[in-house]
UniProtKB/Swiss-Prot annotation:
The reaction proceeds by a bi uni uni bi ping pong mechanism. This is Pantothenate synthetase. Belongs to the pantothenate synthetase family. The lineage of its organism: Bacteria, Bacillati, Actinomycetota, Actinomycetes, Micrococcales. The keyword ATP-binding applies. ATP binds at residues 29-36, 158-161, 187, 195-198. Homodimer.
Amino acid sequence: MTTAAELRAESARLLAAKGGNSQGLVPTMGALHSGHAALARTAVAENDVVVATIFVNPLQFGDAVDLDRYPRTLDADMALLDAEGVDLVFAPSVDEVYPGGQPLVRVTSGPLGEKWEGASRPGHFDGALTVVAKLLHYGLPGGAAADGTTAAYRAYFGQKDAQQLALVKRMVSDLNFPVEIIPVPIVRSEDGLALSSRNRFLSDAERDAALVLSRALRLIESRANAHEPLHLDSAVALVESQPLVELDYFDVVDPATLEPLAENCKETPFRGEGLAIIAAKVGAVRLIDNAPLFS
């Protein structure tokens, strides 16, 4: 489907036909991989009707070259979603999502969106939140639940994009969107690399080099699990020892606010909860990763 009107009508029809009580939404930009399959699989297991969206959002790309380079693999994406049992796929045009050109009114990410990825990619999260807000509206259940009440509505996001996930949760809370945000854990290859649509652009040597990101995260994670000081500087040194990797940031933050934990939390035995976050360029490819910390 390519129009919001079609999506609304078909989701209402399906919800009624199935006697369903819930609808799930899986927003994507396409170029799907096993991580997206996990999102779809989780949504299908938890909802009566599942909608996936495929839309490469121009508002969140600061570089037109990066936008043009982003892979478009619609046929393969549709096959993956069908295999996971997704009911409806919404793949709108840019004109459908932004009729008349770029929107004059947008969702702004505020201070939470200006740090980390936001500092490296100014305006990225304003564009991302604007399209997520629209997709959440498009994906609203088109009809009532079988028992006549409002159908439950859930949207599924990967934990790899930790800052985006935190911002979407905050937007939904602050603006009273009638949807529950469900985080889905990071999916990794057997050697530990977090799955990403951008991994296809890595050479063999760059892919090997990129493994240092997950190794550094595992080092911090093992120290947290053992209630040891995190000694972040040694993990940073590990990443910086790889010549093909240019580190942007590596820190341990509060999972909700993304504020860095106090320095004494990193140099004394770790207690509590945190999130280790990392971003780096490997060759020309920017990669992000993270690891939840508990003790």
